[in-house]
């Protein structure tokens, strides 16, 4: 599914592009939303987990809960994001209670608010927020994977670098929205400044091997997707 929306404000001209690829799965467990305002826009993406339909239900509930709460609140972007994450988590809990066999469902979530001050974000889990600048890609948010702990242990000499890189639990999540206590959350309340030509990519973790295979030509292609 592809959705496109374009907005023009006093501070920028932007192109928004959303795409989903099913891949090897039988059903799509990612959900995304684009909310366009007069002088800012909000990108929200969730990558669900938990059974055949559980992940799909959890990601949809999280995105809907987050988006509705963000629109209701009249606070700073950072405060609105914090409140919206709590609302998203409550929505996942409500779906879990109705889910029966899918009661262990959960989802990651990453949201980016882009306005005249730059980009603010919040994320739970391992869905990346990426900045493409001058054909180079930078990870803006913190990924909540066990890989962070393994790399720290390797740096301290507790385990070898090879053991850290090849550990079977390397990509296990250390935080997610499951209707329970949120163990880790990356919240950027002070906006990160953007410069002309910057591109932002909000994605699920499945995009990593694809991006690694693109190389410089791929970076140029990604930049062109939202070029003016």
Model region roles, listed by residue range:
Residues 1-228:
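PP2C/PPM-type serine/threonine phosphatase catalytic domain
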């Amino acid at each position: 599914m592809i959705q496109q929306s374009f907005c023009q404000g006093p501070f920028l001209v932007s192109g928004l592009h959303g795409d989903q690829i099913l891949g090897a799965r039988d059903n799509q467990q990612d959900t995304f939303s684009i909310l366009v305002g007069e002088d800012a826009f909000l990108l929200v993406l969730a990558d669900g987990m938990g059974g055949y339909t559980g992940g799909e239900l959890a990601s949809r509930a999280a995105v809907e809960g987050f988006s509705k709460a963000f629109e209701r609140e009249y606070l700073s972007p950072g405060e609105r994001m914090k409140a919206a994450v709590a609302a998203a988590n409550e929505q996942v809990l409500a779906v879990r209670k109705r889910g029966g066999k899918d009661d262990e469902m959960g989802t990651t979530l990453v949201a980016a608010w882009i306005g005249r001050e730059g980009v603010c974000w919040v994320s739970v889990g391992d869905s990346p927020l990426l900045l493409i600048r001058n054909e180079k890609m930078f990870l803006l948010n913190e990924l909540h994977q066990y890989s962070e702990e393994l790399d720290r242990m390797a740096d301290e000499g507790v385990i070898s670098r090879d053991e850290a890189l090849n550990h079977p639990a390397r990509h296990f999540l250390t935080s997610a929205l499951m209707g329970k206590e949120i163990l880790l959350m990356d919240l950027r309340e002070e906006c990160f400044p953007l410069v002309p030509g910057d591109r932002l990519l909000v994605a699920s973790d499945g995009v990593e091997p694809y991006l690694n295979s693109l190389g410089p030509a791929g970076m140029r292609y990604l930049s062109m997707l939202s070029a003016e």
